[in-house]
C-alpha cells in the first residue's frame, strides 16, 4: 500500500476523489498481481492445490485498449440476448480478464479503507500496529481472557443470498459515482455468468478462486457492517449501566412524602433496587469478548446461558431485518467452556483444569485446600490436516502416504524443496501447539510422501532410495526454530526434549493462514 500511495501522489490532479480513471493505469494491474507485497517471513509460497496466478503485461495493455472503446461496456449492458451475451464472454468473462479486472477493482476499493486505517492508527499513536495484523496475535489474547469466562458461542456468519447486497454496502464509503456503476455492472453480470453454470445450492460468491480478492473485500465490508452494529449495541448496554440505583432510591424517597406508606415504600424500593441492579448488570457484561477470522467468529462471555441466547437471537434478527435474508439459528452454537473444545484458526482450543492441593497451616491445625486452575490449551487438528493432505494427494484418507505424481517431472532438488517448504510452513504455523507430537505425524506423512515421489521418479523402492540419500533428506524438513530451540535448551536445561515439546511460540508476522489449514477449515 505504501507503493500505491506513491503512485497516487503522482496522479493527483483535479480528480483526487475519483477512482474510475485508475482503471486505465497499468501500474494498478501490476500491484494487483504483485503477491510479494503480502508475503511473510515465515511463509514460503509453494503451489499445493494447483492455482495459477500468472499475468501478462501485453494482455493488460490489450484489456485497457478494449476498455477505452465506449461501446464495449454499453453493448453488454443493453444486451439481453443470451447468445450475444455468450459472444462477449470470450473476452470480458474469460478466466484471465475476469480475474485481473476484479483484483484491480479490489485495489481501487482498498484505497479509501487503507487511508482510513493508517490515519486511525496514527491518531491512536499505536507504533507497531503491523504486529496486530498477525493471525498468531489472537492466541495470546485468548490465553489471557478465556480462562476467566464461562460460555463460548461459535458463529458461522452467513453469506448474503444475492451478491448485490455486498455492493450496496460500499455506496456509503465511496463517492465516485462512475466507479460505483462499474462495480454494480461487474457484480450483476458476474452473477448472471455464474448462474449459467452453477446451481443455486452452491454459494461461491465470497470465496471464488477467480475473484478472491474482490469478493473477500466485499465480504469484509459486509462483516464490518455487522460488527459496527454489534459494537453500537455493546456501547448502548454500557451506558445503561451508568443509571445508578442509588439515584433511583433518592428520587423515590423525594417524591413519596406520605408517612403512612413509608414501610411499604421502603420494601418497594429495596425490591426495585435489587431488580434494577440485576437488569442493568445483565445488559452490561464487561467480560464479553469477540474474535473473528473469515466466516468464523467466537463470542465468549462470563455471563449466563440466557445472556448468550439473547445475543444469538440478536444476530439472527439483525441479519433478517437489516440485510433482508434469513439466517439459520443452528449456525450459532452455545457451549460451556469447561467441557468443550472449539476449532478456530487451525487449532483445537479448550480450557484445561488442573487441580492442586495446598496444605494450609494455622497455629496447631492444618488442612488441605483444593484449588483449580484453568489453562488455555491449543492442539493440532491431526484428523483435519490428514483430510486436507488427502485432498492434495499426499496421502490416503486413512493417512497412508502416497507419491505425488504431478511433481514427478521436477528435479530432485525441487521436489525436496517443495515438500520441505510445506513441512516448514506447517511447523511455523502450528508452533503454538501444546503437543508437538501430534505434528510429527503430519511431518512423517510429508517426508514419506516425498520419498515415494522420488522413488517413483527413479523407478526404485523407497527403502533403497532412503539408504542412498541418508539423513540429507531429513534435514530439509527441520525448521530453523527447531534447530534454535534445541540449541537453547541444550545449553540452559538438561530437559531438552521435554521443553522443546511443550514450548509454545507465537509469531507476530504470520499474516495469512496456511493453505492446508485453510482447506481443512472449509471442508
Swiss-Prot record:
Where can this protein be found? Plastid, Chloroplast
Q: GO cellular component annotations, sorted alphabetically?
A: chloroplast
Keyword Plastid, does the record have it?
A: yes
Presence of keyword Cell membrane? no
Q: Which InterPro entries match?
A: Domain_X, Maturase_MatK, Maturase_MatK_N
**What is a biological process (GO) this protein takes part in?**
mRNA processing
Gene Ontology MF terms: RNA binding
Q: Name one Pfam family in it.
A: MatK_N
Question: Which UniProt key words apply to this protein?
Answer: Chloroplast, mRNA processing, Plastid, RNA-binding, tRNA processing
**Major localization class:** plastid
Similarity remark: Belongs to the intron maturase 2 family. MatK subfamily.
Q: Which PANTHER family match?
A: MATURASE K (PTHR34811:SF1)
Q: What does this protein do?
A: Usually encoded in the trnK tRNA gene intron. Probably assists in splicing its own and other chloroplast group II introns.
Q: What is this protein called?
A: Maturase K
Q: Which organism is it from?
A: Asphodeline lutea
Which gene is annotated as encoding this protein in its UniProt record? matK
Amino acid at each position: 500500500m505504501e507503493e500505491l500511495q506513491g503512485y497516487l501522489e503522482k496522479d493527483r490532479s483535479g480528480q483526487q476523489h475519483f477512482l474510475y480513471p485508475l482503471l486505465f493505469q497499468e501500474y494498478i494491474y501490476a500491484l494487483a498481481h504483485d503477491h510479494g507485497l503480502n508475503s511473510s517471513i515465515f511463509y514460503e509460497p509453494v503451489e499445493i492445490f494447483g492455482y495459477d496466478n500468472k499475468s501478462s503485461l501485453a494482455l493488460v495493455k490489450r484489456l485497457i485498449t478494449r476498455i477505452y472503446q465506449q461501446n464495449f461496456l454499453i453493448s453488454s449492458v443493453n444486451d439481453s440476448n443470451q447468445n450475444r451475451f455468450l459472444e462477449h464472454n470470450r473476452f470480458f468473462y474469460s478466466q484471465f480478464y475476469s480475474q485481473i479486472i476484479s483484483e484491480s477493482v479490489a485495489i481501487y476499493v482498498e484505497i479509501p479503507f487503507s487511508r482510513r486505517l493508517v490515519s486511525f492508527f496514527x491518531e491512536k499513536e499505536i507504533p507497531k500496529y503491523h504486529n496486530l495484523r498477525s493471525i498468531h496475535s489472537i492466541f495470546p489474547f485468548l490465553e489471557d481472557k478465556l480462562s476467566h469466562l464461562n460460555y463460548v458461542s461459535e458463529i458461522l456468519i452467513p453469506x448474503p443470498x444475492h451478491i448485490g447486497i455486498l455492493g450496496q454496502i460500499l455506496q456509503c464509503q465511496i463517492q465516485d459515482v462512475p466507479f460505483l456503476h462499474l462495480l454494480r455492472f461487474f457484480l450483476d453480470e458476474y452473477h448472471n455468468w455464474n448462474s449459467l453454470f452453477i446451481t443455486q445450492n452452491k454459494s461461491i460468491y465470497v470465496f471464488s478462486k477467480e475473484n478472491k480478492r474482490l469478493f473477500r473485500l466485499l465480504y469484509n465490508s459486509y462483516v464490518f457492517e455487522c460488527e459496527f452494529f454489534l459494537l453500537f449495541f455493546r456501547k448502548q448496554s454500557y451506558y445503561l449501566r451508568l443509571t445508578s440505583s442509588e439515584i433511583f432510591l433518592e428520587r423515590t424517597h423525594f417524591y413519596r412524602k406520605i408517612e403512612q406508606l413509608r414501610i411499604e415504600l421502603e420494601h418497594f424500593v429495596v425490591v426495585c433496587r435489587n431488580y434494577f441492579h440485576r437488569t442493568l448488570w445483565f445488559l452490561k457484561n464487561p467480560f464479553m469478548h469477540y474474535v473473528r477470522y473469515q466466516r468464523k467468529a467466537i463470542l465468549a462471555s462470563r455471563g449466563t446461558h440466557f445472556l448468550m441466547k439473547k445475543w444469538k437471537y440478536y444476530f439472527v434478527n439483525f441479519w433478517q431485518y437489516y440485510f433482508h435474508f434469513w439466517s439459520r439459528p443452528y449456525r450459532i452454537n452455545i457451549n460451556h467452556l469447561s467441557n468443550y473444545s472449539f476449532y478456530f484458526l487451525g487449532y483445537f482450543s479448550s480450557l484445561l483444569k488442573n487441580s492442586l492441593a495446598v496444605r494450609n497451616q494455622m497455629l496447631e491445625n492444618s488442612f488441605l485446600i483444593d484449588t483449580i486452575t484453568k489453562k488455555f490449551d491449543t492442539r493440532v487438528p491431526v484428523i483435519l490436516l490428514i483430510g486436507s493432505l488427502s485432498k492434495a494427494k499426499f496421502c490416503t484418507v486413512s493417512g497412508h502416504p502416497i507419491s505425488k505424481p504431478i511433481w514427478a517431472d521436477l528435479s530432485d532438488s525441487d521436489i525436496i524443496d517443495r515438500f520441505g517448504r510445506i513441512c516448514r510452513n506447517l511447523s511455523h504455523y502450528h508452533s503454538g501447539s501444546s503437543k508437538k507430537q501430534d505434528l510429527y505425524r503430519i511431518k512423517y506423512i510429508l517426508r514419506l510422501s516425498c520419498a515415494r515421489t522420488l522413488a517413483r521418479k527413479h523407478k526404485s523402492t523407497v527403502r533403497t532410495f532412503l539408504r542412498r540419500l541418508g539423513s540429507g533428506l531429513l534435514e530439509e524438513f527441520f525448521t530453523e526454530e527447531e534447530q534454535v530451540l534445541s540449541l537453547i535448551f541444550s545449553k540452559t536445561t538438561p530437559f531438552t526434549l521435554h521443553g522443546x515439546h511443550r514450548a509454545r511460540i507465537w509469531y507476530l508476522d504470520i499474516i495469512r493462514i496456511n493453505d492446508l489449514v485453510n482447506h481443512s477449515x472449509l471442508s
